[in-house]
């Protein structure tokens, strides 16, 4: 072991790698179940924000037998257009970039219950798998992530006359070594 402490000792963790390296800084305890619950609250808070803004009438939270959790709402659906600065869909930006979302200006949400949280990108980073399905503008969009990394770009998989967002996630067993049941 070296006793050297100099500029080479300083490590910079960027993006979701920081979340995976130190998950407790973002969601709390990863052993006693509270971190798992925090992840659920993060996704539910986004749906509640749609309801508070007057765009959502129904939120369905399901705990599945495979220890995954899904949250479905009938809000506007996460934006699916290409984000000009990032070059990928706005949905992918929201799911993969810390501190990205529609609650930082005065136009998208007048009321928000979710700003105290860490964001859905943290849930994505700490999930073995996450499925995102968006009903918006007459289309059904879907993207699958593994450990926060998209398998592919957001794709149109069908047509719809509905709107809303569906998120289903499977918490990472590498992160949650203690309590992994909801």
UniProtKB/Swiss-Prot annotation:
Subcellular location per UniProt equals: Cytoplasm
Could you tell me the superkingdom of the organism this chain comes from?
Bacteria
The chemistry this enzyme catalyses reads:
ATP-dependent breakage, passage and rejoining of double-stranded DNA
Q: What is the main EC category here?
A: isomerase
Keywords attached to this Swiss-Prot or TrEMBL record, sorted alphabetically, are: ATP-binding, Cytoplasm, DNA-binding, Isomerase, Nucleotide-binding, Topoisomerase
Under the heading Gene3D superfamilies, the entry gives:
Histidine kinase-like ATPase, C-terminal domain (3.30.565.10)
Which InterPro entries does UniProt cross-reference here?
HATPase_C_sf, Topo_IIA
Q: How does it assemble?
A: Heterotetramer, composed of two GyrA and two GyrB chains. In the heterotetramer, GyrA contains the active site tyrosine that forms a transient covalent intermediate with DNA, while GyrB binds cofactors and catalyzes ATP hydrolysis.
Protein name as it appears in the record: DNA gyrase subunit B
The opening ranks of the lineage are:
Bacteria, Pseudomonadati, Pseudomonadota, Gammaproteobacteria, Enterobacterales
